[in-house]
């Protein structure tokens, strides 16, 4: 959400709809979906737990959206904390992108996360190394790092990317 032009949080009137969740959830939020280079649901002002919203509601919402055939892709960006509800979301997903970095700590944290899920389906799980820098050691390839996964794609470090706008990032080689 950092790179979006409109970072205004989701409307407070939608919070109760996420707290309850029903068969009209997608219909209720559809008019609040924004469009920049892609369509997205605005971010929440605070964490969803602060609103007493179950993370499982996003699995439910994704299933509702998927049934409409309106979108080719439904992307749900989460933090790295694992929970049963995130496990359920992963189970329901057609594709799962796991983003890591090339340092030993990132390999360790990714391995810890993988200890909680079955990631044997190589068509479903894609591993991305973000902010890759060739001048630094790539511990993802070291036997000593005990990496439990193989990286499918490397996304090279982009100098000062935090100063770029979304439309500029979309033109960067390797991000298309």
Q: Model segments located where?
A:
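Phosphate-binding loop that captures ATP/GTP phosphates
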Residues: 1-39
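Phosphate-binding/switch loop-helix module in NTP-utilizing enzymes
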Residues: 24-30, 35-85
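Conserved beta-strand segments of the P-loop GTPase G domain that flank and frequently precede/overlap
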Residues: 42-43, 75-77, 96-101, 125-131
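P-loop/Walker A phosphate-binding loop and immediately adjacent motor/lid segment at beta-alpha junctions
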Residues: 52-63, 111-135
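Inter-motif core of Ras-like GTPase G domains
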Residues: 83-103
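Short, acidic/turn-prone active-site loops that include or flank metal/cofactor-
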Residues: 100-106, 157-159
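Short, charged, surface-exposed secondary-structure boundary motifs
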Residues: 106-112, 162-165
